[in-house]
Amino acid sequence: MNLKLLSSLAFAATIGFASAAYADITIGVIAPLTGPVAAFGDQVKKGAETAVEVINKAGGIKGEKVVLKFADDAGEPKQGVSAANQIVGDGIKFVVGPVTTGVAVPVSDVLSENGVLMVTPTATGPDLTARGLENVFRTCGRDDQQAEVMADYVLKNMKDKKVAVIHDKGAYGKGLADAFKAAINKGGITEVHYDSVTPGDKDFSALVTKLKSAGAEVVYFGGYHAEGGLLSRQLHDAGMQALVLGGEGLSNTEYWAIGGTNAQGTLFTNAKDATKNPAAKDAIQALKAKNIPAEAFTMNAYAAVEVIKAGIERAGSTDDSAAVAKALHDGKPIETAIGTLTYSETGDLSSPSFDIFKWDDGKIVGLE
């Protein structure tokens, strides 16, 4: 065999491999795989991976295999932008994530400018979808919506209690706390103390002293499990019996690990329990086979992959993200593991739903 023939065969083989790689549909996952909220990133990672495995076993999307490419944002906006640029540089057109609002907002700008569609499973800040970006969707509700659920509960059941509102200064935490504050103020409750903590701090004694002086009986915390768990513990160590409330940032098992028995009774809002939805059966079985709990963030990430799949199939294109976005905006229902979803013009869920959950002896239970 001569050298020219060998070269021709080698070139043909290269083209063949390139075509095979190109045939795969790559979905990027931008999530905090390291850093203070890595526990949530891990849930999203596992949910997306499991959804892709199930989809590929069923023949993929339009006959093409789906692969994931992960980019770690560490829960930091600047690193999130770097992760987004990495995704863009790799020519990826679809993304699950980011996980936190503070990262999702700047990342959405980068992705929008470069024609990449994103479906966040967990970024709940209203600002994310309020800017009219055609490429942004989510499989979760917004902070203002979930804050109203908890505020309604407080107004109906704790109107005679002294309520304090605390946040972690972040886009998610402050947004959630401010939405809760506005809702209870509208309903006739004025908070006895409004304050903030700095992520990473360990000693909240000065804040606890202020809360104790104010006679706070209920403390709403907008933020994540690390600071929330420490605050819960230090409140009780100071002899306070204040009930801690919050959003889905307190839903991770690390909240209980940090707060210990002091976290007993903490109430938080989160998406309705998808495991009670018949549509979740296949997803739950797939997760159970891998010993993965069907937690809210995991299920939302699973559904985010399903949303991208539905959009690609409706658009009839595996690489035209604008066509896929248009297809998702058509108002038609999308069947997912967390139920039937439809999207508004902004990329928000048309009918989001939240429930209130409680920490009880280290387990999460629905509020009866």
UniProtKB/Swiss-Prot annotation:
InterPro entries from the UniProt entry: Leu-bd, Leu_Ile_Val-bd, Peripla_BP_I
Cell membrane recorded as keyword: no
Keywords tagged on the record: Amino-acid transport, Signal, Transport
Keyword S-adenosyl-L-methionine included in the entry's annotation: no
Signal peptide: 1-23
GO biological process, alphabetically ordered: amino acid transport
Family recorded in the similarity comment: Belongs to the leucine-binding protein family.
Function: Component of an amino-acid transport system.
Name used for this protein in its record: Leu/Ile/Val-binding protein homolog 3
Lineage: Bacteria, Pseudomonadati, Pseudomonadota, Alphaproteobacteria, Hyphomicrobiales
